[in-house]
Amino acid sequence: LAREMGGCPVAGISVVTETAHFGGTMDLLATVAAAVPLPVLHKDFIISERQIDESAAAGASAILLITAMLETDQLARLIDHGRERGLETLVEAHDRKEIEKIRHLPFDLMGINNRDITIYEIDDSDVGRTEDLARYCGGARLLISESSISSAKDVRRAGASGADAVLVGTAVLKSSSVQKFLYELTSAGWPP
């Protein structure tokens, strides 16, 4: 699957390593990172420097930090540790309060998750949260609309709201043809 995705016009590949709820592993991260020449994002509930060290050792290019799970000082410390290990940081928010909490931090990418991952929400959300919150993110960093992207229409909506990119997960795994699906998304027109 990673090689198939790597043959598409995508900016990178996201790998979930959380085991209990999502069935991922660090071995999967290492396998994907070794298999593709693209940047690989390590997605998990990262709360410690040890996890960041493991991300770097597995070949990740970037890590996800979830604002809802961390205090501001923890976020700052983990961002710094990631940079020391050569990793970019995608800091994720899902409401306006979280955006304000992280605005001053030196992360690389800002994500708006259209689902509330802290409660393992995996329902049929849409990009409405990105549409509601993108205007509060400023324009200094790349903004990524995460999750609930399942069509070219969703991509156009995210772009129209101010997102610079989208992170697609479940819809890729559910598609009958990964390459066809990804080409449909990447040819959606950005921004609309």
Predicted feature residues:
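Glycine-enriched alpha-helix->loop->beta-strand junction motifs that scaffold or abut catalytic
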Residues: 9-10, 35-38, 57-63, 83-87, ...
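Catalytic cores of alpha/beta
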Residues: 47-59, 95-106, 140, 145, ...
